[in-house]
Amino acid sequence: DYKKALKAEDPNPEDLFLHDFAPTPILEEKGERAPKNKEATVMVDSALFAIKEIMAEHPESLLYGQDVGKRLGGVFREAATLAQTFGDNRVFNTPIQEAFIIGSTVGMSAVGLKPIVEVQFADYIWPGLNQLFTEVSRSNYLSNGKWPVSCIIRVPIGAYGSGGPYHSSSVESVLAQIRGIKIAYPSTGADLKGLMKSAYYD
């Protein structure tokens, strides 16, 4: 109430960044980055294998976004076979509505689910930036560390070929300025798989 608030201590300046992020169990790299006698994989397959392993082990995980469900499995085929393996309730398509794709992670996380979502191309993320900035990135801070939104937002960028002015943007320098989110930009298939799995447990 109001009187109780008046008697509360002033915020401590040292606590300003206390709840930018929830504590993480991932503090160091484990395992072999490129195991011997294993065939090298392309980035797309590394993404597929990482998501498949996560979904097999964690029933609370979901994958959704533009064209990731059903038979297509993403425009780069990084979700191929996942809908057939895990069903349409866990791998599904969404409308072409990035604000919904990103914003829905807040509600999904609130009920104990852990969404992995995809914005089809980096250029498309701008309509979802409001949800990313005002809801997802601030969730842990605004709840005093009690309710962090836990999700992975996949944003394909720098893929093979070129896609003209609406499919070729590099957005990482803008996103990296948002406090409360972590950006991973893998350069190898091993990095992609490791970072994806680390992000899930973070």
Per-segment meaning from a language model:
Residues F17-D202:
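Thiamine diphosphate
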